[in-house]
Amino acid sequence: MSDTLTRLAAVLEERRNAAPDSSYVASLYHKGLNKILEKVGEESVETIIAAKDAAASGDCQELIYETADLWFHSLVMLSALGQHPQAVLDELERRFGLSGHAEKAARQPSA
């Protein structure tokens, strides 16, 4: 796992039980999962809009900024649910080299 991701995961974990007025992340945890999910949804939409704008203009700076926000809030969501980013990295590693079609077929229940 990257040093940045490791450090961020540690900070998020520290702030799970911090006073809500001590940081933005602590306030999100205090507001609960629904507020965190709302932020993930908001950042998802902003990322999509930034991608459309980047495709039209060729300028990807806003796309990078919004993607960072989306990743950040997704990490807050995982942490709120007791999950570590390493679990996502492990899942991506598991899928590496596996055909997307084969992976999807393996997930689908038999009819």
Swiss-Prot record:
GO terms for cellular component: cytoplasm. Its main location: cytoplasm. It catalyses: 1-(5-phospho-beta-D-ribosyl)-ATP + H2O = 1-(5-phospho-beta-D-ribosyl)-5'-AMP + diphosphate + H(+). Pathway: Amino-acid biosynthesis; L-histidine biosynthesis; L-histidine from 5-phospho-alpha-D-ribose 1-diphosphate: step 2/9. Pfam families: PRA-PH. The keyword Membrane does not apply. GO terms for molecular function: ATP binding; phosphoribosyl-ATP diphosphatase activity. It is found in: Cytoplasm. Its EC number is 3.6.1.31. It comes from the Bacteria. It is an enzyme of class 3 (hydrolase). The keyword Cytoplasm applies. GO terms for biological process: L-histidine biosynthetic process. Keywords: Amino-acid biosynthesis, ATP-binding, Cytoplasm, Histidine biosynthesis, Hydrolase, Nucleotide-binding. Belongs to the PRA-PH family. This is Phosphoribosyl-ATP pyrophosphatase. It comes from Pseudomonas paraeruginosa (strain DSM 24068 / PA7).
